[in-house]
A protein has these predicted regions:
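N-terminal capping/lid subdomain adjacent to the active-site entrance of alpha/beta enzymes
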Residues: 1-60, 65-74, 78-82, 202-247
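A broad, low-specificity signal for short, low-complexity segments enriched in glycine/proline
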Residues: 21-24, 97-98, 125-126, 181
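Catalytic core of soluble alpha/beta enzymes
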Residues: 34-174
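Structured C-terminal cap/extension of enzyme domains
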Residues: 143, 150-247
Length: 247
């Protein structure tokens, strides 16, 4: 299972927001993530439009990208609670364990999700021990390799916290689908409350891009991690020698 971010970016007109929601519904999406945190009145307006378009039987998640301090996060989320968000992602600084715990306690039943900026198992362990997160968002490129990611997946299972990999980057959708499959097949055996982020751009640079159907990742059929980039893309964009950097 996956969630889409296509309608969630800041700065869209009401018409574009409605059109993106409708297009996502036609493709079978049932989970939508929305950026928030710059202006509460504007976020209320956007969330009202989104709920009008997708209804109340589909899930909405919010993402603040670390913009608040702890008290701001609590007060802001109290104003958005009427829209029944499933989680608030990165409400504050990613290494503020006790701050996340305070937010999680104050805004229940809304969950707290974080992890894309966490570099190792230690910070994840502290977040889990403090009951600071309801969703564990590993980032396969931020952390120290596959073994570090697997350690966090195993810890999350021990604490009963679903793993929802972060995939907002070049090739991350292709990469993290394999970790989600490992979690399901080898660790948790469950898809309940487990989602993989899907960002609908830059897949054309890979030989084996992800395949989506009705809001879900389809299992990859080629060997490897699905992240081999096309030679033309490397020639164009590799830093600092790519053609894109020489103009």
């Amino acid at each position: 299972p996956a969630y889409t971010t296509s309608a969630g970016w800041l700065g869209y007109s009401d018409e574009k927001l409605r059109a993106l929601c409708q297009a996502s519904l036609e493709k079978g999406w049932s989970h939508f993530k929305i950026k928030v945190g710059q202006n509460v009145e504007d976020d209320i307006r956007r969330l009202r439009i989104i709920r009008e378009e997708i209804g109340w039987d589909r899930k909405v998640m919010l993402d603040a990208n670390q913009v608040w301090d702890v008290n701001e996060a609590i007060q802001y989320m109290q104003q958005l609670a009427e829209f029944k968000p499933w989680w608030i992602e990165e409400p504050t600084s990613p290494d503020d364990v006790l701050g996340h715990a305070a937010i999680a306690y104050a805004i229940k039943p809304i969950g707290v999700a974080t992890g894309e900026a966490c570099q190792n198992r230690i910070i994840f362990k502290q977040l889990m021990q403090a009951n600071a997160i309801s969703f564990c968002q590993i980032d396969s490129c931020r952390m120290g390799g596959v073994n570090e990611v697997l350690a966090v997946i195993l810890m999350a299972e021990k604490f009963g916290i679903p793993v929802c990999p972060h995939a907002g980057g070049v090739g991350l959708c292709e990469y993290v689908q394999h970790f989600a499959m490992f979690d399901y097949i080898c660790v948790s055996g469950s898809l309940e409350n487990r989602l993989v982020e899907y960002v609908d751009h830059l897949h054309e640079h890979f030989y084996h891009p992800v395949v989506m159907k009705d809001g879900r990742y389809m299992p990859p059929t080629a060997p490897g991690y699905s992240i081999s980039m096309k030679e033309a893309s490397l020639d164009e964009f590799e830093y600092p020698h790519g053609q894109a950097w020489s103009t």
